[in-house]
C-alpha cells in the first residue's frame, strides 16, 4: 500500500506541475498575443481586451499556485497549498468555459483565423472536464452527502 501511495503522490505532484506550467504559459500568452484570444470573449462581457488580460492574470496566478503545489507534494507531507490551488484551478476552468462555449455555438475563429471542428469542441470540453476533475483531486476535494433531517 505504501508503494501505491508513493506512486499516487508522484502522479499528483507531476499533474500539479504540468497543469501549473500550462496555466502559466497560456496566461503569459494572454499578454503577448492578446488579439488571438479577443474574438472568443462573448460580447455580453464588454471589453474583450480587459477580460483577456484579467483572465491572463488569473491563469498566471493559478499556474504559479499549482507549480508551488507540485513542489509541496514532492517535498512536504502536507497538501495545504494544494487544497487552495486545486480549488482555484477548478473554479477558473469553470469560469473560463463561457468563452469556449461562445466559440463553439457561434463558430468563432481565433485571432489567427483558425477554428475548431465540432469534434475539436467536444474534445476541448472533455479536456476541460478532465482538468476540473484533476484540479479537485489535487485539492483533495471530497463532497459528502448528508441527511439534513437527522
Model-derived features: positions:
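Membrane-interface extramembranous regions
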Residues: 2-150
Amino acid at each position: 500500500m505504501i508503494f501505491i501511495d508513493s506512486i499516487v503522490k508522484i502522479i499528483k505532484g507531476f499533474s500539479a506541475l504540468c497543469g501549473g506550467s500550462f496555466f502559466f504559459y497560456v496566461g503569459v500568452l494572454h499578454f503577448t498575443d492578446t488579439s488571438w484570444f479577443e474574438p472568443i470573449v462573448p460580447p455580453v462581457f464588454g471589453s474583450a481586451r480587459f477580460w483577456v488580460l484579467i483572465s491572463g492574470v488569473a491563469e498566471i496566478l493559478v499556474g504559479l499556485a499549482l507549480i508551488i503545489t507540485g513542489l509541496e507534494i514532492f517535498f512536504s507531507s502536507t497538501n495545504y497549498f494544494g487544497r487552495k490551488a486545486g480549488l482555484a484551478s477548478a473554479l477558473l476552468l469553470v469560469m473560463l468555459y463561457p468563452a469556449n462555449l461562445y466559440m463553439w455555438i457561434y463558430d468563432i475563429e481565433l485571432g489567427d483565423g483558425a477554428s475548431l471542428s465540432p469534434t475539436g469542441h467536444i474534445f476541448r470540453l472533455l479536456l476541460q472536464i478532465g482538468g476540473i476533475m484533476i484540479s479537485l483531486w489535487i485539492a483533495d476535494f471530497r463532497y459528502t452527502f448528508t441527511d439534513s433531517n437527522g
